[in-house]
From Swiss-Prot:
Segments on the Lumenal face: 55-56, 105-107
Name of the molecule in the record: Protein YOP1
Species per Swiss-Prot/TrEMBL record: Debaryomyces hansenii (strain ATCC 36239 / CBS 767 / BCRC 21394 / JCM 1990 / NBRC 0083 / IGC 2968)
Domain comment in the entry: The short lumenal loops between transmembrane domains 1 and 2 and between transmembrane domains 3 and 4 may impart a wedge-like configuration, thus deforming membranes.
InterPro entries: TB2_DP1_HVA22
Keyword Kinase: no
Superkingdom to which the source organism belongs: Eukaryota
């Protein structure tokens, strides 16, 4: 199949999947353009704003991309009865949190990397979509070796923390009543 046919197929798939969205129906009626153009234009504008990073908006938009996509999949997983997708999503949130902590402490270095937030957004989308397996790949390559080396699986320590947290929550409940 030629690239032109692949592009047409992709656009028609977008049109089909968005047929029930009222705002896109209004766009189509008012402009005479397919719904897929609005979707692609919106994504294009989103990435241009990240790329330009005017007023620091790139950081916010990048973090929103890192929250919305896996957040949606996480909400679906919470409502499902299976646990097959839970490991992938838990792995994502561990990678996302680790990445944000490392990023916070390296802001001075990141200032010198051009288009950092664009690269970050692409990375977060890659690790955030469960079908790519990106979160598991990053976890296995970067976080797991560190955690195995420095974080001891101490069940007594975990139980002590859990008991302390329950004690605090019980105290708060007593104060509230």
């Amino acid at each position: 199949m030629s690239y032109q046919n692949q592009a047409k197929s992709f656009l028609s798939t977008i049109d089909e999947k968005t047929k029930d969205l009222q705002i896109l129906r209004q766009f189509e009626l008012k402009t005479g353009l397919p719904r897929s153009y609005a979707i692609l234009g919106g994504f294009g504008l989103y990435f241009v704003l990240i790329f330009l990073n005017i007023g620091g908006v790139g950081q916010l938009l990048s973090n929103i991309a890192g929250l919305v996509i896996p957040g949606y999949f996480s909400l679906l997983a919470l409502e499902s009865t299976t646990t097959s997708d839970d490991t992938q999503l838990l792995t994502y949130w561990v990678v996302f949190a680790t990445f944000n902590v490392v990023e916070f402490w390296s802001k001075a270095i990141l200032y010198w990397i051009p288009f950092y937030y664009l690269f970050k957004t692409v990375f977060l989308v890659y690790i955030g979509i469960p079908s790519t397996g990106g979160a598991v790949t990053v976890y296995n390559a970067a976080i797991k070796p560190f955690s195995r080396r420095y974080i001891v699986n101490n069940k007594k320590f975990a139980q002590d923390i859990n008991n302390a947290a329950q004690g605090v929550s019980s105290s708060v409940e007593l104060l509230a009543s």
